[in-house]
A protein has these predicted regions:
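Jelly-roll (double-stranded beta-helix
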Residues: 1-213
């Protein structure tokens, strides 16, 4: 979140897709009650949110802090480490959500993209495609139909697995469909989906409500 100093310490090699917003990024309103608690039909719950871990061994000595201001980054040198604290107070802190904890919503026939929604902001939404059962009506066609997002640019980052509607898309690939451009499953993928029971895919989709510059 804006105005909070944070640091990621990966256990292994890490590649990151960064999504930045000038407006707050939050859980979808339809997943919450009037008090902000996630409801039972939400595809994830508060227990899935991972909070920071304090590591005192890192909080020593002088340190450089990179601060993003508008479209630039400035470096500030702190004489004392900002993590040299006992803890934090309040509810404003960095957090993590593992896409593997997203519980997919499925149906007898093909469900619309909003069932995959994970986060929302003023000008875009973030969706998670995860391993799930395919549509289970006897006559269902699991592959999505061709469509055109009249008011949205669509970006999909393919994290892992075999994406149900694409061919030749490898791990860490990105596809981009500008608003108004008709698109859908590649040739043969619709027929291939008929009779399939499940999909094994991990992907993150960003649908914007303004054109991407």
């Amino acid at each position: 979140p804006r105005g909070v100093i944070w640091k990621i310490i990966p256990d292994d090699k890490l590649k990151i897709l960064v999504i930045e917003s000038r407006e707050p990024i939050e859980t979808p309103k339809r997943y919450r009650n009037e008090f902000g608690q996630l409801l039972e039909h939400s595809p994830f719950c508060e227990r899935d949110i991972v909070t920071p871990k304090h590591n005192p061994s890192l909080a020593t000595g002088q340190v450089d802090v990179m601060v993003k201001l508008s479209d630039g980054i400035q470096k500030y040198t702190y004489l004392h480490h900002p993590f040299d604290v006992v803890g934090w107070d309040g509810y404003y802190y960095p957090y993590a959500f593992n896409i593997s904890d997203f519980m997919p919503i499925t149906g007898k026939i093909h469900q619309p993209p909003p069932v995959h929604q994970t986060f929302q902001s003023k000008n875009f939404v973030v969706c998670s495609f995860v391993p799930r059962l395919f549509d289970y009506h006897p006559n269902s066609i699991p592959a999505p139909y061709a469509h055109s997002n009249i008011d949205s640019d669509e970006i999909i980052y393919y994290v892992d697995g075999d994406f149900m509607s694409r061919k030749g898309v490898k791990k860490e690939s990105i596809t981009y469909h500008p608003m108004g451009l008709p698109h859908g499953p590649q040739p043969g993928k619709t027929e291939e989906s008929i009779g399939a029971k499940e999909t094994n895919e991990f992907a993150v989709m960003i649908d914007t409500f303004k054109k991407i510059n």
